Amino acid sequence: MDVDHEVKELVKFIKKLGTKGADGKYSVKYGVLFNDDDVANFFEALVGTLKAAKKRGIITFQGEILLQRVHDNVDVILLKDE
């Protein structure tokens, strides 16, 4: 599976699991994303996909990398619907 496909699937999961804010952007807590069974079954390396999506300007989150438990309450925000 290629990174572009994984990023597109990540966008779908953020929209499915997240909520749309007043600014029209979807966001989801990292812990919700990480602990979802469908997400866990789809992504071999969720952190790598998140980093790739952030580098492409599709999502944003505070910090460079997200770790389970430590960053469970960090918002992953969808910037572009691609």
UniProtKB/Swiss-Prot annotation:
Outcome of gene disruption: Cells form smooth plaques on bacterial lawns, produce abnormally small fruiting bodies and display reduced migration towards the cAMP source in chemotactic assays. Analysis of cell motion in cAMP gradients reveals decreased speed suggesting a defect in the cellular machinery for motility. Cells exhibit changes in the actin cytoskeleton, showing aberrant distribution of F-actin in fluorescence cell staining and an increased amount of cytoskeleton associated actin. There is also excessive pseudopod formation.
GO cellular component, one term: pseudopodium
Biological process according to GO: regulation of actin filament-based process; regulation of cell motility; sorocarp morphogenesis
InterPro entries named among the record's database cross-references: Costars, Costars_dom, Costars_sf
Job of this protein: Modulates actin dynamics and cell motility.
PANTHER family membership: COSTARS FAMILY PROTEIN ABRACL
Family the entry assigns: Belongs to the costars family.
Protein name: Protein costars
Species whose genome carries this gene: Dictyostelium discoideum
